[in-house]
UniProtKB/Swiss-Prot annotation:
<dbReference type="GO" id="GO:0016430">
    <property type="term" value="F:tRNA (adenine-N6)-methyltransferase activity"/>
</dbReference>
<keyword id="KW-0819">tRNA processing</keyword>
<dbReference type="InterPro" id="IPR029063">
    <property type="entry name" value="SAM-dependent_MTases_sf"/>
</dbReference>
<dbReference type="Pfam" id="PF05175">
    <property type="entry name" value="MTS"/>
</dbReference>
<keyword id="KW-0949">S-adenosyl-L-methionine</keyword>
<protein>
    <recommendedName>
        <fullName>tRNA1(Val) (adenine(37)-N6)-methyltransferase</fullName>
        <ecNumber>2.1.1.223</ecNumber>
    </recommendedName>
</protein>
<dbReference type="InterPro" id="IPR022882">
    <property type="entry name" value="tRNA_adenine-N6_MeTrfase"/>
</dbReference>
<keyword id="KW-0963">Cytoplasm</keyword>
<dbReference type="GO" id="GO:0008033">
    <property type="term" value="P:tRNA processing"/>
</dbReference>
<dbReference type="GO" id="GO:0032259">
    <property type="term" value="P:methylation"/>
</dbReference>
<dbReference type="InterPro" id="IPR002052">
    <property type="entry name" value="DNA_methylase_N6_adenine_CS"/>
</dbReference>
<comment type="function">
    <text>Specifically methylates the adenine in position 37 of tRNA(1)(Val) (anticodon cmo5UAC).</text>
</comment>
<keyword id="KW-0808">Transferase</keyword>
<comment type="similarity">
    <text>Belongs to the methyltransferase superfamily. tRNA (adenine-N(6)-)-methyltransferase family.</text>
</comment>
<dbReference type="InterPro" id="IPR007848">
    <property type="entry name" value="Small_mtfrase_dom"/>
</dbReference>
<dbReference type="InterPro" id="IPR050210">
    <property type="entry name" value="tRNA_Adenine-N(6)_MTase"/>
</dbReference>
<dbReference type="GO" id="GO:0005737">
    <property type="term" value="C:cytoplasm"/>
</dbReference>
């Protein structure tokens, strides 16, 4: 049985839902602009990684984590209760398409599904979480627009091709691309992932590149971004 993953200030139990901790999730959780946000929404929280990272990074925040899958929701709740921030983390077992809170959010974080139905080969909650049939980009963006405050920011991570498709769909929903970080595993590799920030408000656009591995191990940029979370980072 998978025992999960231990970070510097919290532990992620995987349980039976089969959703392992990924580098994608850690990158997004460390990168998202949530430091000044009072109300944060984690869409499709899985085991709760992004919510826990947000709570650690912003001690004044309240995080609502919405998860449809029963096993994942159960595990996320367990992870929240065992964390130092259990009073600021709220698990909502519900379909985000039917979620109607009383307030809007300053920040939204989401590690979206990105495989289409033709690529689906696995079964179970992990498979559902990774396929766009469960939450198509268009519907996800409509939800974000409805749930986000006028100056709020929504942050995502996607593979390069799907990320560019996502950005084009977002423009049709009147979103501005306000921040983009291109991820390369090494300097010689092509861009593999995109960290994407969207907002209805036209913030000044920022674009950067992050290379994960250098010749001697992890790059300094990657270490600086993730050092407050990974146990082996100084």
């Amino acid at each position: 049985m998978n025992k999960g993953f231990t970070f510097k200030q919290f532990h992620i139990n995987i349980g039976l839902c089969g959703m392992p901790v990924s580098t994608d999730g850690v990158l997004l959780g460390a990168w998202a602009n949530i430091e000044q946000s009072k109300n944060i929404l984690d869409i499709g929280c899985g085991t709760g990684l992004l919510s826990l990272m947000s709570a650690q990074r912003n001690e004044n925040s309240h995080v609502d984590a919405v998860e449809l899958m029963p096993l994942a929701a159960e595990v996320a709740l367990q992870n929240f209760v065992q964390s130092p921030w259990k009073n600021r983390l709220h698990l909502i077992h519900q379909d985000i398409l039917h979620y109607h809170p009383a307030h809007l959010y300053d920040a939204i974080i989401c590690n979206p599904p990105y495989f289409n139905n033709g690529e689906q080969s696995q079964k179970g909650e992990r498979s559902i979480a990774r396929h766009t049939d469960s939450l198509p980009f268009d519907k996800l963006l409509k939800c974000c627009k409805a749930l986000m405050s006028s100056k709020g920011r929504a942050s995502f991570i996607l593979p390069f091709i799907e990320g560019n498709q996502f950005i084009e769909i977002a423009k049709k929903h009147s979103f501005h691309l306000t921040k983009l970080t291109k991820i390369q595993t090494t300097e010689k590799k092509d861009v593999s992932r995109l960290l994407i920030e969207l907002s209805i408000f036209p913030y000044i656009y920022q674009e950067t590149t992050l290379i994960i591995h250098s010749k001697d191990g992890y790059s300094n940029d990657f270490i600086q971004l993730t050092r407050h979370f990974y146990l082996n980072m100084a």
